[in-house]
């Protein structure tokens, strides 16, 4: 048989994959056979399979099969990759929930976020080199959802607005002590110290990130005001006024939430206040298997209900919940555009398969937040005996003024 001609087996595999996908506006092509869905919607993309094994892997396991085949160049997508992934997320097709459940349980065991497991998982994603992340993040190297005051705001302006919002939600005051877990490259801790006069201890187990953060703090003359600690958050022992964690809960692991809650309680007692910013879902379900295996080992974005297991055991009062899903979609659009403009550089640094995998990861993330498959939650909370509770949300939208600070708080006791 000619290498350009499909067999009966190939056509059956295409038909099987179509049944899984349903009437998605995506054409499937293998050699001389083209499968077009029965839909009135315009075709958004054409998926071209280079060989039968690529098609077979996708028919058996769409998530992992497509991710690996696309990364290896055995599948090409002609058209809008983000839009095609949006269609997939919005459809009812795909592998069964039971299959996903079993796979998730296996990955939970394999990638358990113990102290040793967490270090391995974080190293896999965050220690890829600072030069790689510098290609497509903002100038302060923030790798979490930004806040766009306007649709036209730059990524740099939006990331600064996010840090300002975090500080305002916490209502930081000069002289207070703050502990941050999962501090990334250090931007938020440095911003807090410079703009709000607080003293910060920031924990991280990524060696590359913590080294970068320490050098940055030294250049800014913040010795004694910001301390970056290369250690697991579970080893935190000091007392603080404020606990803050941006983009770490999704790395904690569902079976470690109670342990995490005890760490927070140890830090702020029943009178402090805290803030969590994390990727989540509307309902409990596993993370995409390919993302979890290849990109984010140990990752789990919880539902809002699941995340309450961090607050309820310690009798923390949840004061405010906000969803910035569309802000993360826009953040990712900026990252993706910068990544694409640096694609050839990424290939030279990491290889073509790596570059294609990360393109797919970023495209898939844009699609997931646009469609609501993923959410971005910010939760403000306080100890049950915290003496200060914000009376209104006005402080989020007006500049900080020291002389009006007392008017914005009401004493709980």
Placement of each model-derived feature along the sequence:
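A short glycine-rich, Lys/Arg-flanked "PGG" loop and its adjoining helix->strand segment in the class I
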Residues: 258-272
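A short acidic, Gly/Pro-enriched loop at the edge of an enzyme's catalytic core
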Residues: 234-243
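Feature captures hydrophobic
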Residues: 1-159, 165
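Substrate-binding/catalytic lobe of Class I Rossmann-like enzymes that use SAM or dcSAM, i.e.
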Residues: 279-389
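Conserved beta-strand signature within the Rossmann-like core of class I S-adenosyl-L-methionine
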Residues: 271-279
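Conserved class I S-adenosyl-L-methionine
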Residues: 174-184
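Conserved SAM-binding loop of SAM-dependent methyltransferases across substrates and taxa
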Residues: 185-196
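Conserved SAM-binding loop
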Residues: 213-214
């Amino acid at each position: 048989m000619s290498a350009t001609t499909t067999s009966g087996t190939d056509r059956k595999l295409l038909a099987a994959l179509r049944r899984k996908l349903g009437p998605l506006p995506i054409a499937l092509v293998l050699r001389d056979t083209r499968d077009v869905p029965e839909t009135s919607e315009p075709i958004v993309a054409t998926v071209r399979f280079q060989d039968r094994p690529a098609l077979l892997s996708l028919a058996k396991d769409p998530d992992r099969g497509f991710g690996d085949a696309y990364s290896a160049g055995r599948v090409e997508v002609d058209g809008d990759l983000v839009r095609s992934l949006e269609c997939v997320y919005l459809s009812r097709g795909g592998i069964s929930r039971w299959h996903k459940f079993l796979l998730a349980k296996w990955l939970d065991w394999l990638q358990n976020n113990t102290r040793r497991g967490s270090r391995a998982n974080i190293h896999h994603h965050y220690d890829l080199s600072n030069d790689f992340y510098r290609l497509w993040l903002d100038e302060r190297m923030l790798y979490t959802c930004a806040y766009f005051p306007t649709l036209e705001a730059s990524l740099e302006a939006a990331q600064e607005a996010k840090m300002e919002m975090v500080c305002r939600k916490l209502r930081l005051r000069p002289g207070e002590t703050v502990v941050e877990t999962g501090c990334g490259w250090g931007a938020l801790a440095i911003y807090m110290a410079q703009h709000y006069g607080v003293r910060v201890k920031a924990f991280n187990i990524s060696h590359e990130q913590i080294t970068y953060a320490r050098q940055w703090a030294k250049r800014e003359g913040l010795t004694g005001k910001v301390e970056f600690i290369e250690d697991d958050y579970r080893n935190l022992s000091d007392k603080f006024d404020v606990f803050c964690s941006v983009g770490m809960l999704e790395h904690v692991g569902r079976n470690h939430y109670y342990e995490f809650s005890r760490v927070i309680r140890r830090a702020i007692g029943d009178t402090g206040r805290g803030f969590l910013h994390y990727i989540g879902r509307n309902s409990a379900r596993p993370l995409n298997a390919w993302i979890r295996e290849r990109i984010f080992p140990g990752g789990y974005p919880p539902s809002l209900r699941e995340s309450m297991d961090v607050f309820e055991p310690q009798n923390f009062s949840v004061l405010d919940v906000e969803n910035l899903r569309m802000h993360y979609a826009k953040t990712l659009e900026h990252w993706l555009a910068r990544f694409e403009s640096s694609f050839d550089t990424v290939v030279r640094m990491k290889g073509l398969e790596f570059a294609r995998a990360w393109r797919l990861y970023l495209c898939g993330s844009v699609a997931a937040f646009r469609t609501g498959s993923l959410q971005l939650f910010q939760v403000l909370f306080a100890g049950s005996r915290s003496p200060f509770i914000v009376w209104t949300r006005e402080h989020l939208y007006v500049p900080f003024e020291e002389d009006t600070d007392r008017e914005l708080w009401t004493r709980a006791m």
